Amino acid sequence: MSSLTSLTLKGALDGLEKGDFTSVELTRAHIDAIEAARGLNAFLLETPEQALSMAAASDARRALDAARPLDGIPLGIKDLFCTQGVRTTAASKILEPFVPQYESTVTSQLWRDGAVMLGKLNLDEFAMGSSNETSAYGPVVNPWRKAGSNQALTPGGSSGGSAAAVAADLCLGATATDTGGSIRQPAAFTGTVGIKPTYGRCSRWGVVAFASSLDQAGPIAKTVTDAALLLTSMSGHDPKDSTSLDVPVPDFSAFVGKSIKGLRIGVPQEYRVDGMPAEIEKLWADGIAWLKDAGCEIVEISLPHTKYALPAYYIVAPAEASSNLARYDGMRYGLRAEGSNLTEVYENTRAEGFGDEVKRRILIGTYVLSAGYYDAYYLKALKVRRRIAEDFDNAWERCDAILTPTAPSAAFGLGENSSDPIAMYLNDVFTVTTNLAGLPGLSLPAGLDANGLPLGLQIIGKPLDEGTVFSVAGVLEKAAGFTAKATKWW
């Protein structure tokens, strides 16, 4: 059955439609693959019985000619999405015993469309991290390795479990979230496709909050078409989320394969950062050449406030996190530590329940929101955020989409940057601007570095113009011809 796990999501839908195999067979093949790949630590919780039950229900619908858009497709769910009756931890000790009594909007829409849940995927604790090393349940290991090396590499973060599971053929797609690059950077590190849609395109209801004005759900998948199919199901207005946009959801997969002749593609000069590896420079140049060949006009643009994006992000995001994470006090749900009085219970619960990176961000956030520093830090960061959004507004007068690298390097070794938070934060240098401006951004694999590791290109689009992003991505995917897979060692 291993051939079933190597299918794309679209290929699996076609096979199910033709009757080449059943959803139960497809799901069983993925359950077996997950069991054999526990060394990757991609799944925090496996739900094989529930998966097979959902698959059987899917087969029954298909037999009645009542198949839904994703009927029978086995998916992994990032353990930040609440799943009714299934433990949801956000990869934190403080939520270890938490079983939600409700389903997140995004996952309920996937189940509505017939998808199958294989289990919950590992991540950085509360989605805070760029390497999946902050998880209370251990790091995820990237299925990719450097040529001739056994060194364990990071899959990126925070959606490291989602990216690793898709790259290792453990699921046909996965849900993920992106606050500063947490879909796109792991996709780049694992040779997968990931899209963060426009802020408000997918509901945040039932997704454990990190930074509410930046968080956005999206899919990680094997191909651009697969990502488009998943995003179509995940998107839509939700009255339970006050930031959800009440706009129509197109069939995003219809945009893949469209001609992009005449499109203006912006290339921001500020993204040519010092110390960027020559391989990433070359990949970017290749991407520009491929789009020129497709009939695009390449336009040099300026996003002058880019250099302030990371500092602004690492003020705004921790500030919102310190507020959001105040709810974890041991009273209503999650871990409760012992103490001789109420204050001690609060203090001990949070001290025992949160990991170091989460504590670091709560402290930073509390500091920048404090009376003496609010104006100097938080208010100033909000002004910078507005300037960054204005930079993009000005750029859209000259271009229709923007092409950049996704990350400043290929996957690095586990433990390599964990002692230096600043070095870790620099992984987000190309991705945080789209979160600050609320724009759609997609990463797709476009080449390998000298060590045989995947490298990604990022396409940034206008607000709610995921369609153009998918059209450009489809052309780049075809031109790059990226078919490499991680050599199985697990």
Swiss-Prot record:
> Which residues, if any, are the signal sequence?
none
What GO MF terms are annotated?
Answer: ATP binding; glutaminyl-tRNA synthase (glutamine-hydrolyzing) activity
A cellular component annotation (GO) from this entry:
glutamyl-tRNA(Gln) amidotransferase complex
InterPro entries referenced in this protein's UniProt entry, alphabetically? Amidase, Amidase_CS, Amidase_dom, AS_sf, GatA
A family per Pfam: Amidase
Keyword ATP-binding in record: yes
Which domain of life does the UniProt lineage start with?
Bacteria
**Active site feature:** K78 (charge relay system), S158 (charge relay system), S182 (acyl-ester intermediate)
Its EC number is: 6.3.5.7
**Protein's GO biological process:** translation
Gene3D superfamilies in the cross-refs: Amidase signature (AS) domain
Entry keywords, A to Z: ATP-binding, Ligase, Nucleotide-binding, Protein biosynthesis
**Catalysed reactions, as listed in the record:** L-glutamyl-tRNA(Gln) + L-glutamine + ATP + H2O = L-glutaminyl-tRNA(Gln) + L-glutamate + ADP + phosphate + H(+)
Q: Which family does it belong to?
A: Belongs to the amidase family. GatA subfamily.
Describe, as the record does, how this protein assembles with itself and its partners: Heterotrimer of A, B and C subunits.
Role according to the record: Allows the formation of correctly charged Gln-tRNA(Gln) through the transamidation of misacylated Glu-tRNA(Gln) in organisms which lack glutaminyl-tRNA synthetase. The reaction takes place in the presence of glutamine and ATP through an activated gamma-phospho-Glu-tRNA(Gln).
The protein's name in its UniProt record: Glutamyl-tRNA(Gln) amidotransferase subunit A
Encoded by which gene? gatA
